[in-house]
Amino acid sequence: MSKRGRGGSSGAKFRISLGLPVGAVINCADNTGAKNLYIISVKGIKGRLNRLPAAGVGDMVMATVKKGKPELRKKVHPAVVIRQRKSYRRKDGVFLYFEDNAGVIVNNKGEMKGSAITGPVAKECADLWPRIASNAGSIA
């Protein structure tokens, strides 16, 4: 798989259950000052008639800030999903899910805007985005 599509990422992206359609509101798990993120599109999704684009762990999305610092609101930011409530299957056969849906604000290259992440980061996301993995407190 080409690395060009996911700027700044490394490793192979495996198929996981997509639990966050366009319109989902997720927690912002970094220290940028944003409280939540509203997903408006998913990067790399071509789509099909009447099907909402959906994101899963490790996907880059375009999002707006609904609650948070005024300088972050009313703008479109790229973000990466780091946790999802919808269970997904790992290659070793274990099913995994988190207690919340969360993401972090990044730039187009995949470098974090903030400098800290609250809560665990999914291993699938950490493998794809090295800059997020370096700021993660714990990787689950």
Swiss-Prot record:
<keyword id="KW-0687">Ribonucleoprotein</keyword>
<protein>
    <recommendedName>
        <fullName>Large ribosomal subunit protein uL14</fullName>
    </recommendedName>
</protein>
<dbReference type="GO" id="GO:0006610">
    <property type="term" value="P:ribosomal protein import into nucleus"/>
</dbReference>
<feature type="modified residue" description="Phosphotyrosine">
    <location>
        <position position="38"/>
    </location>
</feature>
<dbReference type="GO" id="GO:0005925">
    <property type="term" value="C:focal adhesion"/>
</dbReference>
<dbReference type="GO" id="GO:0045202">
    <property type="term" value="C:synapse"/>
</dbReference>
<comment type="similarity">
    <text>Belongs to the universal ribosomal protein uL14 family.</text>
</comment>
<dbReference type="GO" id="GO:0005829">
    <property type="term" value="C:cytosol"/>
</dbReference>
<dbReference type="GO" id="GO:0070314">
    <property type="term" value="P:G1 to G0 transition"/>
</dbReference>
<dbReference type="GO" id="GO:0032991">
    <property type="term" value="C:protein-containing complex"/>
</dbReference>
<dbReference type="InterPro" id="IPR036853">
    <property type="entry name" value="Ribosomal_uL14_sf"/>
</dbReference>
<dbReference type="InterPro" id="IPR000218">
    <property type="entry name" value="Ribosomal_uL14"/>
</dbReference>
<dbReference type="GO" id="GO:0000122">
    <property type="term" value="P:negative regulation of transcription by RNA polymerase II"/>
</dbReference>
<dbReference type="GO" id="GO:1990948">
    <property type="term" value="F:ubiquitin ligase inhibitor activity"/>
</dbReference>
<dbReference type="GO" id="GO:0003723">
    <property type="term" value="F:RNA binding"/>
</dbReference>
<dbReference type="GO" id="GO:0072717">
    <property type="term" value="P:cellular response to actinomycin D"/>
</dbReference>
<dbReference type="GO" id="GO:0002181">
    <property type="term" value="P:cytoplasmic translation"/>
</dbReference>
<dbReference type="GO" id="GO:0003735">
    <property type="term" value="F:structural constituent of ribosome"/>
</dbReference>
<dbReference type="InterPro" id="IPR019972">
    <property type="entry name" value="Ribosomal_uL14_CS"/>
</dbReference>
<dbReference type="GO" id="GO:0001223">
    <property type="term" value="F:transcription coactivator binding"/>
</dbReference>
<dbReference type="GO" id="GO:0050821">
    <property type="term" value="P:protein stabilization"/>
</dbReference>
<dbReference type="GO" id="GO:0005840">
    <property type="term" value="C:ribosome"/>
</dbReference>
<dbReference type="GO" id="GO:1903450">
    <property type="term" value="P:regulation of G1 to G0 transition"/>
</dbReference>
<dbReference type="GO" id="GO:0005737">
    <property type="term" value="C:cytoplasm"/>
</dbReference>
<comment type="function">
    <text>Component of the large ribosomal subunit. The ribosome is a large ribonucleoprotein complex responsible for the synthesis of proteins in the cell.</text>
</comment>
<feature type="modified residue" description="Phosphoserine">
    <location>
        <position position="17"/>
    </location>
</feature>
<keyword id="KW-0597">Phosphoprotein</keyword>
<dbReference type="GO" id="GO:0005730">
    <property type="term" value="C:nucleolus"/>
</dbReference>
<dbReference type="GO" id="GO:2000059">
    <property type="term" value="P:negative regulation of ubiquitin-dependent protein catabolic process"/>
</dbReference>
<dbReference type="GO" id="GO:0070180">
    <property type="term" value="F:large ribosomal subunit rRNA binding"/>
</dbReference>
<keyword id="KW-0689">Ribosomal protein</keyword>
<dbReference type="GO" id="GO:0022626">
    <property type="term" value="C:cytosolic ribosome"/>
</dbReference>
<dbReference type="GO" id="GO:0031625">
    <property type="term" value="F:ubiquitin protein ligase binding"/>
</dbReference>
<dbReference type="GO" id="GO:0010628">
    <property type="term" value="P:positive regulation of gene expression"/>
</dbReference>
<dbReference type="GO" id="GO:0032986">
    <property type="term" value="P:protein-DNA complex disassembly"/>
</dbReference>
<dbReference type="GO" id="GO:0008284">
    <property type="term" value="P:positive regulation of cell population proliferation"/>
</dbReference>
<dbReference type="GO" id="GO:0005654">
    <property type="term" value="C:nucleoplasm"/>
</dbReference>
<keyword id="KW-0963">Cytoplasm</keyword>
<dbReference type="GO" id="GO:0016020">
    <property type="term" value="C:membrane"/>
</dbReference>
<comment type="subunit">
    <text>Component of the large ribosomal subunit.</text>
</comment>
<dbReference type="GO" id="GO:0022625">
    <property type="term" value="C:cytosolic large ribosomal subunit"/>
</dbReference>
<dbReference type="GO" id="GO:0006412">
    <property type="term" value="P:translation"/>
</dbReference>
